[in-house]
Amino acid sequence: IYKDQALVNWDTKFKTAISDLEVVSKDVSTQIYYIKYPSSDGGSITVATVRPETIFGDTAIAVNPTDQRYQSFKDITFTIPLTSRTIPLVFDEYSDPEMGSGAVKITPAHDFNDFEVGKRHNLELLNILNDDGSLNDKCPKDYVGMDRFDARKKIVKALKDQGFIEKIEDYKTTIPYGDRSNTIVEPYLTNQWFCNAEELAKQAISVVRNGETEFFPSNWEKTYFQWMDNIQDWCISRQLWWGHRIPIWYDESNTPYAGFSEEDVRKKHGLKGELRQEDDVLDTWFSSSLWTFATMGWPEKNEKLNLFHPTTTLVTGFDIIFFWVARMIMMTKHFMKEVPFKEVYITGLIKDESGQKMSKSKGNILDPIDLIDGVSLEELLTKRTEGMMQPQLKEKIIKQTKKQFPEGIESYGTDALRYTFYSLASPGRDINFDIGRIKGYRNFCNKIWNAFRFIEMQVANHGYQTGESSENILSDWMGSKIFQTAENCQTHIKQYRFDLASAEIYELVWSNFCDWYIEFSKVAIQKSDDANQTNNLIGSLITNFYSILELLHPFMPFITEELSSKLADLAEVEKSSFIIEGGFAHARASNKETEQQLDEIINIISAIRVIRAENQNIKNETFNLIISNDLSSEMQSVISKNESVIVGIAKLDGIQFTDKIPLESIEKTMDGYKLIIPLEGLIDPEEEMMRLQKELADVENDIKIISSKLANEQFISKAPTAVVEKEKAKVSDAESKKAMLEKSIAKLQP
């Protein structure tokens, strides 16, 4: 660590140095000024600049040593316009002979490239700005104290009036802005503290290359190396009130001393006179780089440091890989001789639903607490418009917010929000946050509560005695589904695929458990006339639901912990621990055979429901189901054993296995066998034919009207794309319906 006079990015609003990564480059339209500098031989040379206010800081004009136009200018000096000060000509490869006149003004104290040229030619470093961006007393008195941009206008007018302007052109360029202040950043000459980062970076590069620390997704390692391979010395001092004050004390001769305190410095160096502590504070990221070990009692070696260092995983955003991640690795490797963490998981940024980065200036910030607890429109407007850096945008933000949230934001709950983020957490991708998603996961939370209420109702209606539950196909099927989901989820989580893990659990809970297992159990309990069997079915519900809660717990800790307590009370057992202390759906086992058997029964019931939907005439009828003998005898036996439950769910009169197919029937081909529904006695063929033909005629007419609209070139060219696509979808749906009706008519024809 050393102190030096150097150029830094200076934020004139906050009056502090900022790092390169805190600078945002913006494309702007400005003007470029061609200014004539009188020469000592009676002529002049023209240089171009977009910052005429910096001419008072010029200390040379540079041309390329290969530029033949200026070989005779070696001993000529130039006078800075509006002053009497002369500056030399220097030959430097920084100047491009192909750009403009080939001559550039060199202002070492106000341009990073010029600073390097100045070092090569031992030029004076002339700072002409105050820390607030106004011109200082190194400038002509007419401009002293003026804001830099006000001074620009006055200087350009004076240059024009005195004939120093050759021409002015419109010009597009990029200008640096402070990411927090949104003001133009100035290269500014100050005394700052620096950290020589090159040696530190070598170790930090090595640990990632050799796999001691890994990035997930791995493509972020490339970004890490790009920064680290081109690292510059790090300016670690800041001119702010907040932060760790730099532990340096100066004596009366301005000699610096480092120490833990003034007392430590005096004792270490035997100092008696007055000491003054450094006013600057450390860059936040310098302090933060010590986080992994400084918070654990370092430099003392203690149990906490040994236990928790290094840690396993750092979860962070890509925008602070260099700010924080790289610097933690550098510092920890230097001081602790080990890596701070073994894995770095990079999340995406959470943006608004249209993909815009959330910011106060855009008025699109969503506070997670407001999504959890809800917020009124009035409160939301206050949050989005209070203390704005750009108050002129206030009305626009109010209008936009009222349109998006006319009633404010309703309460969605913590677990619904948490699950939403899990579901959107695809590796390395930014998240476009759509409030519709959190509504869906609030419904999911309600679904879980309703599942518990169903179990609670069964216990209330039938009672429940704890004990060993005997095996049954429903419980074994559900247990196997839970087991497989748990296995898959553990794999996904190890790979940081929280989106895939949450999707699998969602499917398990909503479809397998709530839609099928509960429905099967409801019918099985209704049809049971055996108290032990009923108790067994309820016990299986409780066991499987607890396993569901274990699976859900990392994703929904609040709801699952609450429901696990209620479940224990329901079963009249003592809850011995929190879910987090238990396993990950540990009590389940795989049973592929049973799983496949009940899956096939579900396929049969689903097929019957599709047939009902496609044939409105039998939608609400009960009927016998015929299954062809192509179905395996083992599967026929399983269906027969569970016929009462299947009949109850599918609303059938009965099930029989035969190859005899009635003349009037509906057939559905399954995987290697057929489902047949006899129609005799269910419908009047003539009436049904008339109904189907009328419906077909209506559908054909709809197709004709929509197709005519889509054939109209004027409609296609003028209508919004979404409207055109909607009409195309209507045609597609109508064509599908037409095919279905024609198929039904064909079945009724002799």
Model-derived segments and their meaning:
Residues 171, 227-232, 236, 240-249, ...:
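Catalytic cores of enzymes that engage adenine nucleotides and/or redox cofactors via long glycine-rich
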Residues 1-44, 99-253, 288, 318-320, ...:
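Residue patterns forming the tRNA-binding/recognition surfaces of aminoacyl-tRNA synthetases
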Residues 1-132, 207-237, 286, 294-308, ...:
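NTP-handling and nucleic-acid-processing catalytic cores
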Residues 439, 566-750:
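C-terminal low-complexity, glycine/proline- and small-hydrophobic-enriched intrinsically disordered tails
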Residues 7-16, 171-181, 246-254, 343-350, ...:
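A glycine-rich phosphate-binding loop feature that marks nucleotide/adenosyl-phosphate handling sites
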Residues 52-61, 166-197, 438-464, 554-568, ...:
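Structured, non-catalytic alpha/beta "coupling" segments that mediate domain-domain communication
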Residues 112-123, 156-159, 321-337, 605-612:
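Metal-dependent nuclease catalytic cores in nucleic-acid-processing enzymes
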Residues 5-24, 250, 275, 351-352, ...:
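Acidic, turn-prone loop/beta-hairpin segments
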